[in-house]
């Protein structure tokens, strides 16, 4: 690996969204997104797929900590202790979205997109993804 950032092209993103949709449809599940640094791009990619209304429930864009707490029930303590860009926060975001909607799957993302805002501990480009289902959650 070169260590250089990579980007996913539109065709690859669409193919990935189709695959996610196919798997969700096959399971009879619906998904909710809880996004910060992506500002709605995940749910946009998913809803670009025809028929996505059968498996996409909704998407939250919670850019601020206030929105994370208000809309997704992320605790102030988690944000104070770990920050918005952390494993703990994305797990709370995913679980909060799942609880708010009652669907079967949630994805959450929070990161430091740049060009500024990074620190030595969390440089620009740091991103956490979290997934939640009724019986478990992972990052």
Predicted features by range, described:
Residues 1-139:
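Short alpha-helical segments enriched in small residues
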């Amino acid at each position: 690996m070169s260590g250089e950032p990579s980007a996913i092209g539109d065709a690859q993103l669409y193919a990935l969204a189709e695959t996610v949709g196919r798997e969700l449809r096959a399971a009879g599940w619906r998904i909710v997104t809880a996004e910060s640094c992506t500002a709605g791009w995940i749910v946009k990619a998913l809803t670009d797929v025809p028929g996505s209304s059968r498996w996409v429930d909704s998407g939250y864009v919670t850019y601020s900590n206030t929105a994370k707490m208000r809309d997704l029930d992320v605790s102030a303590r988690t944000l104070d202790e770990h920050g918005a860009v952390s494993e703990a926060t994305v797990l709370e975001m995913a679980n909060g979205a799942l609880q708010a909607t009652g669907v079967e799957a949630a994805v959450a993302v929070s990161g430091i997109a740049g060009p500024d805002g990074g620190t030595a501990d969390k440089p620009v480009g740091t991103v956490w993804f979290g997934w939640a289902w009724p019986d478990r959650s992972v990052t």
